[in-house]
Every structure is written in structure tokens, then in C-alpha cells.
Curated annotation (Swiss-Prot):
Its main location: endoplasmic reticulum. This is Reticulon-1. It comes from Pan troglodytes. Residues 589-776 form the Reticulon domain. Interacts with NDRG1. Interacts with BACE1. Interacts with TMEM33. PANTHER family: RETICULON-1, RETICULON-LIKE PROTEIN. It is found in: Endoplasmic reticulum membrane; Golgi apparatus membrane. The gene is RTN1. InterPro entries: Reticulon, RTN1-4. Keywords: Endoplasmic reticulum, Golgi apparatus, Membrane, Phosphoprotein, Transmembrane, Transmembrane helix. GO terms for cellular component: endoplasmic reticulum membrane; Golgi membrane; neuron projection; postsynaptic density. The keyword Membrane applies. It comes from the Eukaryota. Inhibits amyloid precursor protein processing, probably by blocking BACE1 activity. Residues 1-103, 136-168, 204-244, 285-580 are annotated as: Disordered.
Length: 776
């Protein structure tokens, strides 16, 4: 296809892969490049047989144009290993120009030659068979021709031939790698993404094509006669469906820092006559800073819509559109600040964009922190200018993604870039640019994967917590494992404070422990002191002290096995519950009444009997005085005995009753409130019941109470109150034990007594009219 400029310009033919397009300078001014083994290009008016009708048609147009018309400039595309086809043997672009009005096509040629760098070349312009024809570069004989080998031709080490917003970059290729790719059909199929680039005409120049129908006919005839050299690729569009190319203007001063190709008008006559050698290309993905594009647009706003128009200040660019994606993980955010061109809106580049989009989608699967392999030091030093303009690291091609996807590792692991320059080069927009790249080739997308910093920090925290917990477990061995796992490790300062607090409490309870350790009579020194807890070790790191329990006397332990149905001693008390009084405890009273501790029960039972018999013989005042004298005589005698014993043995054991002296016998407010409430309940209940009986709320109940009082008159005449109290105490200490031993017989007799009593009550109720009606 061709892109006509203005009436003074010639159509620009598109060169397919494996073919070379050449336009010789007219009137014998310049000579074309004559490769080894190829036929020299003829002068104007003498087309060579190798070029056929194409060269003859060009010569005739050139001869008839005259000085008023400018000779056309053709852009030429070639691949490695092509020999003897046209005037340019085995490299990409070669153009010639005729002196005219000063407007011509810009060439993609650099006259600066550098030593060949075989190790830094890639080639991705793959050729393949189409429509049953074989292109020239696929000929095995020509690929094996010694004259066409790439090492004999010096490479061009331009670090960016030109750049555009489409971002396709050219890289020198190596002949050995090209032969390998061409020989392998599988690699040839995988590299279809780099086959063709569609350069078509924009809509704004269609009217110019209508003004020159004969030029269009000549150009179409010119292409039809050249089908034996260049076969039209499938990816190239027809003229009726153009994908316009957006022309971007880049000034000369923006391109001074890199070795860009000079323009045609700037070339001298010697340079035009000299053979121009170029290198094959590789299409890679790079990025351009938006600032450069903005500067370019501000400086040349009126030339944004010029598409391949002959001018010394223009550089043709090729735009390969990519689908915009607003997702956060997208590497191709929507373009801003510039209107999308026709090629961008259509998104139908002749480069296999299915493969390119597949590569972009695969890159989307990764995070923004896609790792880039470290660049060589030499390459970083050689490309300071390119870093200022180039974008983020090279996006891997579809071929490279097959290898990089296998190395991506676990999807949960973030990819962190090891190259510090990757963060500086990270830009939001992706482009494709043409240009010769020197130095070592860009490394394929095989990022070195490492764990993210956050994950490493988390693992370090877990390790430190495990170490702290192990240390705490060793220092506090009595703590339960569940508490060690659930509760966070405590600091040493908190543990020290707990140890000091427990130590102070242990010192306060020490006298009470020693007092309970010594044997003494509970009858002589009854106490209502709360039960003290055992002392905690000063160095114990346990947070929960053991619950204090009352020590069991030997008598109680000896009598505990006598009754299997009897309940054992009092259990451990809760930390918040106030300890009850010694002789007012319900469990303690049950143990005394059931004679579970014979010695203790005997002492208590004997003391009660002595007191009651004394009261029967003497007055209460006399009994209290005598009991006090007896207690004092016992304590004083024991105190003197201990003092004499310590003097004789020359020991200093201290006061014999020191433990009891330090024992606190005060009642707490909670204990007083507890027993006061209980007493209040019984007092109130008794008063209510007496009121109900005496006020005859219920006649039957009142009569029963009257009968009870009549019987008590007989009991009072026979027994004294102290005798009754004595009989009650004896019954309390004897009846429970007798009932346990003879429970079956007692229950039988109690049943008979209950039946007899019920019969008597029934007879009495039958004789009382009011009681009978009440029973009904």
C-alpha cells in the first residue's frame, strides 16, 4: 500500500518482510548500494533486469518529472541474510533523494558505523511462507551464502534511532540466531507478533489521492509487477480500510544526545553516494516519559496531524494501539492529554496484536512491582540519555512470557524489584518505539523472585514471639500451657511487680500459718479468724496463687473413714468468698455431730456438758468466774513451765503462745453482715408467725399452738430449762450417730409412730366441727 503526500510527492510503498524496495536517484547523480554478488543498479532511464518493471516505471516517472517535481523517496525494509535481491543487501532501510524544493521523506538510515556486536543482537522480524511462495530471505542457499553473513557487515550502535508514542524499538540482530529461528518452524510460528507493521494513509489525505489518479495507478502497477520479490503479507490492510499512522514531530535538539539517523537534506553528496548499511531490527517494548511528548507537542502543535509528509523536520512514527484499561493492575492506563489517533481508536495494527495483548494481560497478573533482572554495569553507563527518556523496564514479549510465567512462583508472594533503577524508570504509559539499540541485549523477562519485605518482617516477628514464649515458659514452669499460648508474654518488670506483691502477702500470713501448725485446744481459744493461705515461694513466677485450705487434724483424719456416707472436710474456698468462722461452719458442725473426728468431737461435747452441769448447780456469774480462773491457771502454768525449760536448756524459743497472740480474731464486716442477715431472717419469720397465731388468722393453727403450749406446762413442771438444754446437747451428739448405725429399724418404728399420730389427729378433727369443714 502507499501513502501519498501532496501533488509533488511520490507514493510511499510498504515493504513486506523479506523484500527490499529501492528507488535510485535520477539523472545519474547517485549510485545505489551494490552488495556482493548483486547486480549494480543502473542510472536513470536504464532500469536493471533484477528490478524489472518497478525500476523502469520509477525511471520514467523521474525522467518526465523535470525540475519542478521532486524525486520520490522510498522506505525500505529488509531482513538478515538476504543477498542479491536489490541494491541494499541485508539491512533494513535505505533511501535516496533528489535535490528539489527541500521537502522529502525522512530516512531511517545512519551513516555512523560501529564495530559489529554479535553478542548484543536479537532479531524478531520472522519470515514465513505465504500463499505458496517463498520469500527471498527464506532461501537456504542464500542464507548460507558467505557474502551475506552478518559478521562481515558492521553494525550500527544507535541508542534510539527515533522514538514515538507507539514505542517500537529496533535492535541489531545476529545472523546465527536468525538462521536458528528460520530453521525452526515452531519458533517461526511463535514469533508471528513481529511480522508486519501496517503503515496506511490517514483520512485527511484521501482527497490528494483523487487528484492524482495516474500516480495511484502507476503505484499499484508498480507493486503488482514486483510480487516475485515481495509477497504481500496477510496482516497488511487493503487501501479501503486504512489504519492511519499518527505522525509525531521530534525536533533535532531533542535527538542530539543520542546517535539518531541524520535527515536526508543534511547529507552531503559524498554521503549520499556512499553505500549505506543498516541492520535488522527487533521489535521490543519500551516507554517514553510523558514530559518529552508534552514538550514536543507544545513546540509543534500545528504539525500533530501530519502523516509522513515530506519535510526535513519530521520523523515518521508508527503507532501500535493497545486496549485501555482502567484497572489498578493494568500496565496500559488510558492516555491523557492527547486525543487517540485513528490507529489507536481502531486497535487493529498489523503486528499480531493478539499475541501482544496476551502478553499485556499476562503482565497484568503481576503486581506493579514486577521484578526486572539487574542490568549490566556497562549498559547502565552507556545509556544515560536513554534512561532520561525511556520508560519502565522492557515488557517481555509473548515468547519471553512463556519462560517468565513459569518463574513467577506462588501467586501470594509479591514480586519486588531488585534493580534500584526500575523504580526510577517506572512510568504509567506504555509505548513501542523503533530504534537501534547498542550494548548488551535486553535480558529476557526472567525476574528474580524474592519474598516481600512485609512477609519477611512478619516471619521475624513470629520468630521473636516464639523465643519470648519459650523463655517465659522456662521461668514460669507452673503456669498452664494454655495460658502461655493464649496470653501474650509479660515483660520482666510486670513479673517482678507480681512477685513483690505476693511476697508481701506471704509475709502478712506467716504468723497465721505458724499458729495453725502448733497443736492447741479449740475450746480454750476459739477464734473466728479467716483461714490463711499457704506461703508462696518468693521466686515463684506463677500468676495464680494456690487456694488456701484448712489443715485437717489427726483426729479428723482418723475418723473420716468410719462413715462412707459422710461428707469429707470443707473444700477449697474461692478467692473472693470470705472465709467463715471456725465453729460456725456448717460442714464443721456436721463433722462434729457425726463424730468424724473423735478427739475433737469429744473435747467439744465434754466442754458443753461441764458448762451445763455447772449452771445447774451454780449461778451464771459464778460459773463464768470459775471458768476464767481455770483458764488462767492453765495458761500461766504453761507459760512458767516453758520459761523454766528455756532457761535450763539455754534456748530462746520465744513466747509459747506467740502464734496465738499474732492470730487475728476480729470479724470482718462481710462476716458480720452475713450472720446479721441470717439472724434477721429468722427473727422476722418468727415474729410474723407468732402474729398470725396469736391474732387467729387461721383458727386451726391457733388451736394447735394452744395445745402445744398446754403440753409444755407439764414439761416445765418436770424439767428445768438447763436440763432441757442439757438433754438437747446430748441428743445432738448421740442421735445422728445412732440413726446412721440403725437407720432401717429406726425408719420402721418412725413409720409406725407417724401412723398412730395421724389416726389420733383424725379422731380429734372429727369431733371439732370447724376443723372438719376446714379439712373438707
Amino acid at each position: 500500500m502507499a501513502a501519498p503526500g501532496d501533488p509533488q510527492d511520490e507514493l510511499l510503498p510498504l515493504a513486506g518482510p523479506g523484500s527490499q524496495w529501492l528507488r535510485d536517484r535520477g539523472e545519474g547523480e547517485d549510485e545505489a548500494v551494490t552488495p556482493k554478488g548483486a547486480t549494480p543498479a543502473p542510472q536513470a532511464g536504464e532500469p536493471s533486469p533484477g528490478l524489472g518493471a518497478r525500476a523502469r516505471e520509477a525511471a520514467s516517472r523521474e525522467a518526465g518529472s523535470g525540475p519542478a517535481r521532486q524525486s520520490p523517496v522510498a522506505m525500505e525494509t529488509a531482513s538478515t541474510g538476504v543477498a542479491g535481491v536489490s541494491s541494499a543487501m541485508d539491512h533494513t532501510f535505505s533511501t535516496t533523494s533528489k535535490d528539489g524544493e527541500g521537502s522529502c521523506y525522512t530516512s531511517l538510515i545512519s551513516d555512523i558505523c560501529y564495530p559489529p556486536q554479535e553478542d548484543s543482537t536479537y532479531f524478531t522480524g520472522i519470515l514465513q511462507r505465504e500463499n505458496g511462495h517463498v520469500t527471498i530471505s527464506e532461501s537456504p542457499e542464500e542464507l548460507g551464502t558467505p557474502g551475506s553473513s552478518l559478521p562481515d557487515v558492521p553494525g550500527i550502535e544507535s541508542r534510539g534511532l527515533f522514538s514515538s508514542d507507539s514505542g517500537i524499538e529496533m535492535t541489531p540482530a545476529e545472523s546465527t540466531e536468525v538462521n536458528k529461528i528460520l530453521a525452526d518452524p515452531l519458533d517461526q510460528m511463535k514469533a508471528e507478533a513481529y511480522k508486519y507493521i501496517d503503515i496506511t494513509r490517514p483520512e485527511e489525505v484521501k482527497h490528494q489521492e483523487q487528484n492524482h489518479p495516474e500516480l495511484e495507478d502507476k503505484d499499484l502497477d508498480f507493486k503488482n509487477k514486483d510480487t516475485d520479490i515481495s509477497i504481500k503479507p496477510e496482516g497488511v490492510r487493503e487501501p479501503d480500510e486504512p489504519a492511519p499512522v499518527e505522525g509525531k514531530i521530534i525536533k533535532d535538539h531533542l535527538l542530539e544526545e543520542s546517535t539518531f539517523a541524520p535527515y536526508i537534506d543534511d547529507l552531503s553528496e559524498e554521503q549520499r553516494r556512499a553505500p549505506q548499511i543498516t541492520t535488522p531490527v527487533k521489535i521490543t517494548l519500551t516507554e517514553i516519559e510523558p514530559s518529552v511528548e508534552t514538550t514536543t507537542q507544545e513546540k509543534t502543535p500545528e504539525k500533530q496531524d501530519i502523516c509522513l509528509k515530506p519535510s526535513p523536520d519530521t520523523v515518521p512514527t508508527v503507532t501500535v494501539s493497545e486496549p485501555e484499561d482502567d484497572s489498578p493492575g493494568s500496565i496500559t492506563p488510558p492516555s491523557s492529554g492527547t486525543e487517540p489517533s485513528a490507529a489507536e481508536s481502531q486497535g487493529k495494527g498489523s503486528i499480531s496484536e493478539d499475541e501482544l495483548i496476551t502478553a499485556i494481560k499476562e503482565a497484568k497478573g503481576l503486581s506493579y512491582e514486577t521484578a526486572e533482572s539487574p542490568r549490566p554495569v556497562g549498559q547502565l553507563a552507556d545509556r544515560p540519555e536513554v534512561k532520561a527518556r525511556s520508560g519502565p523496564p522492557t515488557i517481555p514479549s509473548p515468547l519471553d512470557h512463556e519462560a517468565s510465567s513459569a518463574e513467577s512462583g506462588d501467586s501470594e508472594i509479591e514480586l519486588v524489584s531488585e534493580d534500584p533503577m526500575a523504580a526510577e524508570d517506572a512510568l504509567p504509559s506504555g509505548y513501542v518505539s523503533f530504534g537501534h539499540v547498542g550494548g548488551p541485549p535486553p535480558s529476557p523477562a526472567s525476574p528474580s523472585i524474592q519474598y516481600s519485605i512485609l512477609r519477611e518482617e512478619r516471619e521475624a516477628e513470629l520468630d521473636s514471639e516464639l523465643i519470648i514464649e519459650s523463655c517465659d515458659a522456662s521461668s514460669a514452669s507452673e503456669e498452664s500451657p494454655k495460658r502461655e499460648q493464649d496470653s501474650p508474654p509479660m515483660k520482666p518488670g510486670a513479673l517482678d511487680a507480681i512477685r513483690e506483691e505476693t511476697g508481701v502477702r506471704a509475709e502478712e500470713r506467716a504468723p497465721s500459718r505458724r499458729g495453725l501448725a502448733e497443736p492447741a485446744s479449740f475450746l480454750d481459744y476459739p477464734s473466728t479468724e479467716p483461714q490463711p493461705g499457704p506461703e508462696l515461694p518468693p521466686g515463684d513466677g506463677a500468676l495464680e496463687p494456690e487456694t488456701p485450705t484448712l489443715p485437717r487434724k489427726p483426729e479428723e483424719d482418723a475418723s473420716s473413714h468410719q462413715s462412707p456416707a459422710a461428707t469429707k472436710g470443707p473444700g477449697p474456698l474461692g478467692p473472693g468468698a470470705p472465709p467463715p468462722l471456725l465453729f460456725l461452719n456448717k460442714q464443721k458442725a456436721i463433722d462434729l455431730l457425726y463424730w468424724r473426728d473423735i478427739k475433737q468431737t469429744g473435747i467439744v461435747f465434754g466442754s458443753f456438758l461441764l458448762l451445763l452441769f455447772s449452771l445447774t448447780q451454780f449461778s451464771v456469774v459464778s460459773v463464768v468466774a470459775y471458768l476464767a480462773l481455770a483458764a488462767l491457771s492453765a495458761t500461766i502454768s504453761f507459760r512458767i513451765y516453758k520459761s523454766v525449760l528455756q532457761a535450763v536448756q539455754k534456748t530462746d524459743e520465744g513466747h509459747p503462745f506467740k502464734a496465738y497472740l499474732e492470730l487475728e480474731i476480729t470479724l470482718s464486716q462481710e462476716q458480720i453482715q452475713k450472720y446479721t442477715d441470717c439472724l434477721q431472717f429468722y427473727v422476722n419469720s418468727t415474729l410474723k408467725e407468732l402474729r398470725r397465731l396469736f391474732l387467729v388468722q387461721d383458727l386451726v393453727d391457733s388451736l394447735k399452738f394452744a395445745v402445744l403450749m398446754w403440753l409444755l406446762t407439764y414439761v416445765g413442771a418436770l424439767f428445768n430449762g438447763l436440763t432441757l438444754l442439757l438433754m438437747a446437747v446430748v441428743s445432738m451428739f448421740t442421735l445422728p450417730v445412732v440413726y446412721v448405725k440403725h437407720q432401717a429399724q429406726i425408719d420402721q418404728y418412725l413409720g409406725l409412730v407417724r401412723t398412730h399420730i395421724n389416726a389420733v389427729v383424725a379422731k380429734i378433727q372429727a369431733k371439732i366441727p370447724g376443723a372438719k369443714r376446714h379439712a373438707e
